């Protein structure tokens, strides 16, 4: 039996389809971050992008997301090293660091239910951007 692609290929060797499938759909990338103007320190909030369906943790308009959210970040093989803020559970980060996918990952389990059960997804903490008045009141630790 052959090994899964993520165990035999580097991130650079993966097809676009394989690359996209690494995303566990936790929604952590879709939580807004605030940056301190003086220190450049990044603060994580529980404020979800307007395009995030909090229940499913999926973008409502993934293919056209940049039209709706010009500041949305596109994670690629080329800019991955610049995203040190990615959660420690992120498959892209784990593989970039030479670590295995975590046991609950949808590619291993076959569904996202284990990820939600482990409370990795933002479904239990996210609030809608439209409902937020003071973003500073929604600062959390790294998700």
From Swiss-Prot:
Designated name of the protein: UPF0260 protein plu2141
Cross-referenced NCBIfam families: PRK05170.1-1, PRK05170.1-5, PRK05170.2-1, PRK05170.2-5
Organism the protein comes from: Photorhabdus laumondii subsp. laumondii (strain DSM 15139 / CIP 105565 / TT01)
InterPro entries xrefs: Puta_zinc/iron-chelating_dom, UCP006173
Family: Belongs to the UPF0260 family.
Coiled coil: none
